[in-house]
């Protein structure tokens, strides 16, 4: 997320420095699946998040073209759409309920019979009772996205320090003044905290103002399809939250577990079994495909599973974290919103419900009275 914000700010003429704890573009975005599923992922209670997601989805085609031109790297934006399948009658009943809810929000979705779904995806298990198709929920190759953003920021003149984690944000006179890294101390007019699942690991920030972000572990794997006869065209969502994402290079990405296990990066037998069994129940012919890669990523989950965008409650310290499962989808709108906030002190209307201030509690009063921080205000 930090790279996209840096790119937008550099385009506006701002001098920007990015500090990455690893190799640029190889954090949570590298471990993701690249789904831009604003419609089919929407659940009751997420109406405000849907507004933000739809705006970002609207921005994505132009964002992709602009980034490819700026970096010289294709990010393989694909618009075949997303299919959610039901494998049993119970699945179909639940899917119908979700479909009706999503349609009530004005989302463009189509209910497919099992036969219609199999005409579109012949390798689906015979006898499935139904599916939902969203032609607006696209995908992007997230690893190429990370590489393209890293190249774009370099070409835009951003100073990019890799394998250089920020240890501490310097806060003096109730405002952020700079950062401490292995390089030493660097002053800053504004600090944007976009550290994903590691956002609470940054020192110097009063505990009352640390973002309530935790790592949510996800195990994933990739299978190798025949390039001449790929098994799937659409992104495929499964009844219990798994998904299959076909890539043009022949990989079939299978994801992803959702585990509250801190930063445990081990692949487990149970995790692999869950992924493979879920995929096999929908597309039995995957049993013939070789496994070519397994990996673990950490989604940055907030207390309400929605992002934190804007004022931290400390002057000149801005948050862009907590995107959970929607980091790739929300990249364009986050980059635009945070760059606008840095430059004008205001968020776009669609981002206003997601300020970190919604989590500030009574401890802020004590911090303000002690002089560590000031009351939240826009720049």
Language-model features: locations:
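Dinucleotide-binding Rossmann-like beta1-alpha1 core, especially the glycine-rich loop
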Residues: 35-120, 278-280
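Active-site substrate-recognition segment that forms the wall
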Residues: 4-12, 18-21, 34-36, 40, ...
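Hydrophobic/small residue at the entry helix of a nucleotide-binding pocket
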Residues: 1
């Amino acid at each position: 997320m930090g790279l996209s914000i840096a790119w937008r700010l550099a385009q506006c003429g701002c001098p920007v420095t990015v500090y990455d704890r690893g190799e640029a573009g190889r954090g949570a975005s590298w471990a993701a699946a690249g789904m831009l599923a604003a419609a089919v992922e929407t659940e009751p209670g997420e109406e405000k998040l849907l507004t933000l997601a739809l705006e970002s989805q609207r921005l994505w085609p132009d964002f992709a073209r602009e980034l490819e031109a700026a970096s010289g790297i294709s990010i393989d934006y694909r618009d075949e759409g997303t299919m959610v399948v039901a494998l049993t009658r119970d699945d179909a009943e639940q899917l119908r309920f979700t479909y009706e809810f999503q349609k009530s929000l004005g989302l463009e979705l189509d209910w497919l019979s099992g036969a219609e779904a199999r005409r579109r995806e012949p390798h689906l298990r015979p006898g499935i009772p139904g599916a939902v198709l969203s032609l607006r929920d696209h995908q992007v190759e997230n690893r190429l996205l990370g590489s393209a953003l890293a190249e774009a920021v370099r070409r835009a003149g951003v100073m990019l320090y890799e394998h250089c984690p920020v240890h501490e944000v310097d806060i003096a006179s109730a405002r952020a003044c700079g950062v401490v890294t292995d390089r030493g101390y660097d002053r800053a007019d504004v600090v944007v905290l976009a550290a994903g699942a590691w956002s609470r690991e940054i020192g110097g920030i009063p505990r009352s103002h640390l973002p309530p972000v935790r790592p949510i572990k996800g195990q994933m794997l990739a299978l190798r399809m025949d390039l001449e006869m790929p098994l799937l065209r659409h992104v495929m969502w499964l009844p219990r939250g798994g998904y299959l994402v076909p890539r043009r290079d022949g990989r079939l990405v299978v994801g992803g577990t959702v585990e509250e296990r801190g930063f445990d990066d081990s692949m487990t037998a149970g995790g692999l079994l869950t992924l493979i069994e879920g995929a096999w129940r929908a597309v039995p012919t995957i049993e013939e495909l070789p496994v070519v890669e397994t990996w673990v990523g950490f989604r940055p989950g907030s207390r309400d599973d929605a992002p934190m965008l804007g004022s931290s409650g400390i002057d000149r310290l801005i948050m862009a974290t907590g995107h959970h499962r929607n980091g790739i989808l929300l990249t364009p709108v986050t980059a635009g919103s945070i760059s606008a906030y840095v430059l004008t002190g205001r968020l776009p209307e669609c981002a206003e419900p997601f300020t970190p201030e919604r989590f500030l509690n009574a401890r802020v009063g004590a911090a303000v009275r002690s002089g560590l921080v000031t009351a939240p205000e826009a720049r």
